[in-house]
């Protein structure tokens, strides 16, 4: 049986076709070419506002469910970053003229919210190893796209670094410390009977829902 790190690398290899679609997504390319109307930037803000708020609650729910201290520490450690991102997202909303009543009234698209709904399912029904694997496989493409989106918003739409800090918080490669903590959580899960098929399924579905997120944002942004 493969260890945690080896298994994660295998899963990443298996999901390379989806990874490639994420890293060459038409929404990100459209932003870089200034093809998304400025008023339509509200779509990604509205969708992310719902997603991050949901993810915060999902991660907190997983913390409460964790029986092993190592898993609990790992998920607890993700909360400050998510909370900081939620605050930074409000700065972006303000820069675009979107206030709190607008954010609360925003009507999400089903495609863009599939990701957050599956994270909530993982938090309540899956093992810590499944959720950690899914997040670890997902983060590289998400981070790469965030880096490009933040840069495009500054270069093509004139937004400041402060306004685009939400995307900068997620940009760049996954920290090695995060990878090591995931490996330990996955190793614990494998040791306690979590099957490799369960880990593969969680990662495959979350990565597919990530692609649906970008598809939904693009469709809603270009329909306006």
Question: Where do the PLM segments sit?
Answer:
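Long amphipathic all-alpha helical oligomerization modules
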Residues: 172-203, 215
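Charged/polar positions within long, soluble alpha-helices
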Residues: 53, 57-60, 87, 91-94, ...
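Acidic, carboxylate-rich catalytic segments that either coordinate divalent cations
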Residues: 2, 193-224
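Acidic, low-complexity proline/glycine-rich segments
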Residues: 1-27, 106, 110, 175-180
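Short, hydrophobic/aromatic alpha-helical segments in well-folded domains
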Residues: 44-47, 58-61, 74, 118, ...
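Active-site-proximal alpha-helical scaffolds that flank and shape metal-associated catalytic sites
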Residues: 70-173, 208
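Alpha-helical bundle segments that constitute or directly flank the non-heme di-iron/ferroxidase center
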Residues: 13-23, 31-65, 130-147, 207-214
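Short, charged/polar, low-complexity loop and linker segments
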Residues: 27-33, 188-192
């Amino acid at each position: 049986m493969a260890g945690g790190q080896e298994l994660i690398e295998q899963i990443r290899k298996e999901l390379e076709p989806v990874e490639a679609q994420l890293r060459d997504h038409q929404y990100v390319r459209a932003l870089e070419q200034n093809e998304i109307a400025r008023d339509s930037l509200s779509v990604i803000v509205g969708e992310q506002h719902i997603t991050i708020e949901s993810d915060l609650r999902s991660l907190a729910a997983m913390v409460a469910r964790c029986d092993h201290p190592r898993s609990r520490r790992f998920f607890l450690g993700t909360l400050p970053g998510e909370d900081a991102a939620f605050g930074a997202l409000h700065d972006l909303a303000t820069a675009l003229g979107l206030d709190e009543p607008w954010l609360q009234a925003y009507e999400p698209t089903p495609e863009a919210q599939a990701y957050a709904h599956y994270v909530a399912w993982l938090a309540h029904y899956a093992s810590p190893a499944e959720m950690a694997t899914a997040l670890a496989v997902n983060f590289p493409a998400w981070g790469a796209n965030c880096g490009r989106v933040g840069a495009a918003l500054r270069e093509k739409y004139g937004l400041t670094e402060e306004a685009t800090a939400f995307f900068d918080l997620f940009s760049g490669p996954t920290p090695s410390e995060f990878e090591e903590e995931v490996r330990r959580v996955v190793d614990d899960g494998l040791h306690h009977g979590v099957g490799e098929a369960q880990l593969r399924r969680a990662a495959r579905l979350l990565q597919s829902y990530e692609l649906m997120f970008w598809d939904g944002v693009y469709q809603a942004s270009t329909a306006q």
